[in-house]
Structure formats: C-alpha cells, structure tokens
C-alpha cells in the first residue's frame, strides 16, 4: 500500500463515521502549494462554505500560500463565513492527513475564530 492509498483509506473511515453521526463537516485538503477547506452539509451533497489559498481575499496579506500562516488565514476566513451563515458546530475531517503542521494551524485558527469541533 502506497502513501496516497493509505491516506485515502484513513479518510474513508473518518468520513463514514461522520456520516453516521449526521454532522456538518469541515473538510481539509492540502497540496504542497495550497490548502483548501470546505464546510459540507450533513447529507454530503452541498458545500455550504469554502475558503482556500487560491482566493485573493485570503492571499493578499500572505507572502507564500503553502505554509502555516496561509493555513491559519484560510481557517480564520472559513470560520468567519460559516458563522455568518449560522454554522457554529462542525466535525473536523482531515482527509487522512496527519493532524500536524498546516492542518493543525487551520484547525486552531478556525477554533479561535469561533467554530466548535
């Protein structure tokens, strides 16, 4: 089993559990250059809120889009948008990525901005 298939296997297990709970989920995906986050409805078919380092509103204050500072900016922007839509409680779906570095920075910034998970 290679690295990518192991990550996908871990992500599938977590998503199955979150779906059983019927919770709104905050999904994170990272690449070497960017990080993406979405809040997805409990039925899994609708994206309620999204933020990423591809957006000018997020990256205009950043020097580079692939570091922890960028991830924290995405987490803060996502939390603010979610709270505007009345979403305050989510389940964190790290998509099989290790809870460390950029994924952790995004989660911490979202918590500080008011999301509960």
Curated annotation (Swiss-Prot):
Pfam families reported for this sequence: Ribosomal_L18p (PF00861)
Gene3D superfamilies per record: 3.30.420.100
GO cellular component terms, A-Z: cytosolic large ribosomal subunit
Cystine crosslinks: none
Keywords for this protein: Ribonucleoprotein, Ribosomal protein, RNA-binding, rRNA-binding
Coiled-coil blocks: none
GO MF term list: 5S rRNA binding; structural constituent of ribosome
InterPro entries, per database record: Ribosomal_uL18_bac-type, Ribosomal_uL18_bac/euk
GO annotation terms (biological process): translation
Protein family membership: Belongs to the universal ribosomal protein uL18 family.
Subunit structure: Part of the 50S ribosomal subunit; part of the 5S rRNA/L5/L18/L25 subcomplex. Contacts the 5S and 23S rRNAs.
Functional summary from the UniProt entry: This is one of the proteins that bind and probably mediate the attachment of the 5S RNA into the large ribosomal subunit, where it forms part of the central protuberance.
Protein name: Large ribosomal subunit protein uL18
Taxonomic source organism: Serratia proteamaculans (strain 568)
